[in-house]
């Protein structure tokens, strides 16, 4: 069978289901593929296939994730669903599956539960920008007042973590009903169609990497006689054009220079674009004035910082992480983009130690500044071995 060509004519949006165990995330995921396959002709995926999600490795961390795709009238959605709570924690912290928006599934019969809260908090910490709510199992609730109560609780919870609780769309329905092709009182297929329409209208189209301001992490520095200094790396976002002014940020005081050439596979180009590996020739910059671990960026778009609040997942012993807990004052290396920088960890009030397999919020102080912004991912290493993964939740200074 010939492979289908991937059609790129619709905007691509990444979403995922979050919420407490057994509230119906996987059932809703399967129902979404069923309803969209009937309405918009995308492929249907069965519950069992999603539920037995394959193991993946992201940065040495084992995560079980199911990936499904479905189409609406105007968009193509890539959707992630994780079987276990630990998988969500790892997934969100490592950014293995970055979400442009999340579907919070909450059982109308049970209301918000501990993981409902934790997933909302994680979404805030790792920078999931939008949440849409699906109040599931509504066919099991006869009392309209109870539904209203649960809806209020969910809105309060969202507001607690700085999401717009009052304005968040909440769809009431039954994923199981929709999965079985039923639709009593519009709670089945109608509710799921409404959910898809809400995703279309409430989650804005993400800005593509190429439309963001230029940034390239420096991997290597060369000196070419008669030409000057060339730095190489993969352009993370944006475009760099010849004769544009750029900044060198991180590790040392920020300096300005001009890009006098872009090279790729020994060919000279006028520009380097997001996703490309290229060499950038820097005017008047000496070989020893720039190093791996710094970034080239559009002037004024990114600043160097040393202190930040982070959400961290500590690898378990089975994942090749530490065998013992660590305590406050722990000083590992933090690997940002292309380099390690030593830093010290301050644990939250009342947390004495962190065990392998835990996730924890911490404040990190680095010994050298790194070009960073909220949402930047990093690894925690000890002598080159990865022992944790984290994300910058909030820059302190």
Curated annotation (Swiss-Prot):
GO terms for cellular component: cytosol. It is found in: Cytoplasm. Gene3D superfamilies: P-loop containing nucleotide triphosphate hydrolases, Translation factors. Residues 10-207 form the tr-type G domain. InterPro entries: EF-Tu_GTP-bd, EF-Tu_GTPase, EFTu-like_2, EFTU_2, G_TR_CS, P-loop_NTPase, Small_GTP-bd, T_Tr_GTP-bd_dom. It comes from the Bacteria. This is Elongation factor Tu 1. It comes from Stutzerimonas stutzeri (strain A1501) (Pseudomonas stutzeri).
């Amino acid at each position: 069978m010939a492979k289908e060509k991937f059609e790129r004519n619709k905007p691509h949006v990444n979403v995922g289901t979050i919420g407490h165990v057994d509230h119906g995330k996987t059932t809703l995921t399967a129902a979404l593929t069923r309803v969209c396959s009937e309405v918009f002709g995308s492929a249907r995926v069965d519950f069992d296939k999603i539920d037995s999600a394959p193991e993946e490795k992201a940065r040495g961390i084992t995560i079980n994730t199911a990936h499904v795709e479905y189409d609406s009238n105007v968009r193509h959605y890539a959707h992630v669903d994780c079987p276990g709570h630990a998988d969500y924690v790892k997934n969100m912290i490592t950014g293995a599956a970055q979400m442009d928006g999340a579907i919070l599934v909450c059982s109308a019969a049970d209301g918000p539960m501990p993981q409902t809260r934790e997933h909302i908090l994680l979404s805030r910490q790792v920078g999931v920008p939008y949440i849409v709510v699906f109040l599931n199992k509504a066919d099991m609730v006869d009392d309209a007042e109870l539904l209203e109560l649960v809806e209020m609780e969910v809105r309060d919870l969202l507001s607690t973590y700085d999401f717009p609780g009052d304005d968040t769309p909440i769809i009431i329905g039954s994923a199981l009903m929709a999965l079985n092709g039923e639709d009593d009182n519009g709670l089945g297929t109608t509710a799921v169609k409404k959910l898809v329409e809400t995703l279309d209208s409430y989650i804005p189209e993400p800005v593509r990497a190429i439309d963001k301001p230029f940034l390239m992490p420096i991997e290597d520095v060369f000196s070419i006689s008669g030409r000057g200094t060339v730095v190489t790396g993969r352009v993370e976002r944006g475009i760099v054009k010849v004769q544009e002014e750029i900044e060198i940020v991180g590790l040392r005081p920020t300096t300005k220079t001009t890009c006098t050439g872009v090279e790729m596979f020994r060919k000279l180009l006028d520009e380097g674009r997001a996703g490309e590996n290229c060499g950038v020739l820097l005017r008047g910059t000496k070989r020893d004035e720039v190093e791996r671990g710094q970034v080239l960026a559009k002037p004024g778009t990114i600043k160097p910082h040393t202190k930040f609040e982070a959400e961290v997942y500590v690898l378990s012993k089975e994942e090749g992480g530490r065998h013992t807990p660590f305590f406050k004052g722990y000083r590992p290396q933090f690997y940002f983009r292309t380099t390690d920088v030593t830093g010290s960890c301050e644990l939250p009030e009342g947390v004495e130690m962190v065990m392998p397999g835990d996730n924890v919020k911490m404040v990190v102080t680095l010994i050298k500044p790194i070009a960073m912004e909220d949402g930047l991912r990093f690894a925690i290493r000890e002598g080159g071995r990865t022992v944790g993964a984290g994300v910058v939740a909030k820059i302190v200074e």
